[in-house]
Every structure is written in C-alpha cells, then in structure tokens.
C-alpha cells in the first residue's frame, strides 16, 4: 500500500499552498542541504566507529 501518483500530487499541492510559489525554492534548497548534512554525518559517524575499534 504505497503512495499513488494522485496522493503525491495532493501532498505537493498542500506544500505549494502552505509555502507559496516564492518560498518553495528556498524551502526545497534548505531541505536538500539538511539531507546532505545528515548523510555526511551518518557517513562520518561510521568512520569514527571504525577508528575506535582498531
């Protein structure tokens, strides 16, 4: 029971209404930066564990 295309469209429409057309690019940019920082943090955390185990 995954999200269908119509569900995704509704979610995107709600986001568009909440943030407006002007702010949406900034919100998406901030979200992408946050995800990138999270992934780098997870990668760095794994590297720290390898160093402490040796």
UniProtKB/Swiss-Prot annotation:
Task: Please provide, alphabetically and separated by semicolons, the GO molecular function terms listed in this UniProt record.
Answer: protein transmembrane transporter activity
Keywords of the record, alphabetical order, are: Cell inner membrane, Cell membrane, Membrane, Protein transport, Translocation, Transmembrane, Transmembrane helix, Transport
Query: Which Gene3D superfamilies does this chain map to?
Result: 1.20.5.3310
Question: Its GO CC terms?
Answer: TAT protein transport complex
Q: Which GO terms describe its biological process?
A: protein transport by the Tat complex
The record's subcellular locations are: Cell inner membrane
Q: Which residues cross the membrane?
A: 1-21
* UniProt cross-references to InterPro entries, sorted A to Z: TatA/B/E (IPR003369), TatA/E (IPR006312)
Q: Write down the membrane topology.
A: Single-pass membrane protein
- NCBIfam families linked to this entry: PRK01470.1 (NF002402), tatAE (TIGR01411)
> So what does this one do?
Part of the twin-arginine translocation (Tat) system that transports large folded proteins containing a characteristic twin-arginine motif in their signal peptide across membranes. TatA could form the protein-conducting channel of the Tat system.
PANTHER family, A to Z:
SEC-INDEPENDENT PROTEIN TRANSLOCASE PROTEIN TATA
Which proteins does it associate with, and in what oligomeric form?
The Tat system comprises two distinct complexes: a TatABC complex, containing multiple copies of TatA, TatB and TatC subunits, and a separate TatA complex, containing only TatA subunits. Substrates initially bind to the TatABC complex, which probably triggers association of the separate TatA complex to form the active translocon.
**Its family?**
Belongs to the TatA/E family.
Q: What is this protein called?
A: Sec-independent protein translocase protein TatA
Give the gene that encodes this protein. tatA
